[in-house]
Structure formats: C-alpha cells, structure tokens
C-alpha cells in the first residue's frame, strides 16, 4: 500500500512519535469535520486589497467543492454569462471553433488531488490553512503537480431553523491578487 501523498512528511515535522501522532490525529479530525460537498455561493477578488471585478469567473459563477475525510479534494468553478460560455458541447463537434472552446476554458477551472492540513500553522475545526495538492488533475496543465495553498474559515449558522455550514476559502494568486470564495455545505 502506497503512502498517502498528503501524509508523507508528518514524522519529519516532529521529533517525537507521540507528537507526530497528535499532529496526525488533529489533521485527521479537521479533515473529517471539513468533509462534504459544497456549492459556490460567491467569489470576490482584490488586487493589493482593492476590490476588482472577477474577470475569470464573471459576476455569477457556479461551482462545487468536495473534501473527503480520507484526504482528497475536487474543485470546479465556471462562469455562467453567455459571453463566457458559448454553446459548445462534449464531445466537441466539428463546427465548434477553437475560439469558443478557449473562451470556456478561460472562464472555468477544475482540479483534484490530495487534501492536507498545513500543520506548520495553527489549525482547528474553524480556521487554518489547507493544501490542495500536489494536484493530480487540472484543466490548466501547469497546475498539475503543484499544491494550492488555501486559508479556510468555517461558519455555522441557522437559516430557517436549519443549521447551515459555510466555508470561506481565501487564496493568494500572486502579483497582489487575492481571491475569496464562499461555499455552502450541501451534503
């Protein structure tokens, strides 16, 4: 049985087997609490902390985020505006243009891979830092093999007398760009 990529290195982070076990148990407990399927509620982008329009996903994106307790994840987000989603089909048809497909690709993202808690930083059931990866699948080729760092905050609230869980995911995108995504747990 091959070691889970997200778990490799725990012993290197600690000097004691007891500490290593505590780190693993804590990370495992957090992954278990985060496990589920989430629907995208909204996104926002900033550059150098100044709000900017989200040029990638548009003004009304849809998406799904899946975290498993065993340490895997999948994320998909796409724009919904017709200008960003030409009516192409899968498998592609001969009359569909590369330009139409490029537009779809430019305004969507999909990736999957291991999921881990960054144990080098404080983390608990409500906030910390996740590592999406190293990614094994991505529609953007340069993302394969790379880990995406994501800060998380879990918010539980009541809506219509039902407990609802939201996860806010923050990501640094380089060049002063930052994204914040809100996800609602649906399963």
Stretch-by-stretch model annotation:
Residues 1-24:
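Fungal secretory targeting signals
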Residues 17-110, 117-187:
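Lipid interaction determinants
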């Amino acid at each position: 049985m091959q070691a889970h990529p997200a778990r490799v290195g725990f012993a290197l982070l600690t000097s004691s087997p007891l500490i290593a076990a505590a780190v693993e148990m804590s990370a495992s407990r957090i992954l278990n609490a985060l496990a589920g399927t989430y629907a995208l509620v909204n996104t926002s982008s900033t550059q150098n902390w100044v709000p900017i329009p989200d040029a990638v996903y548009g003004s009304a994106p849809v998406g799904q985020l899946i975290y498993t307790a065993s340490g895997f994840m999948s994320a998909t987000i796409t724009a919904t505006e017709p200008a960003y989603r030409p009516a192409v089909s899968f498998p592609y048809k001969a009359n569909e243009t590369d330009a139409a497909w490029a537009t779809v690709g430019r305004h969507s993202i999909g990736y999957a891979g291991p999921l881990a808690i960054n144990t080098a930083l404080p983390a608990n059931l409500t906030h910390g830092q996740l590592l999406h990866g190293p990614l094994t699948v991505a529609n953007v080729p340069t993302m394969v093999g790379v880990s995406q760092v994501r800060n998380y905050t879990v918010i539980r609230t009541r809506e219509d007398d039902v407990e609802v869980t939201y996860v806010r995911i923050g990501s640094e995108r380089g060049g002063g760009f930052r994204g914040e995504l809100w996800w609602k747990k649906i399963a």
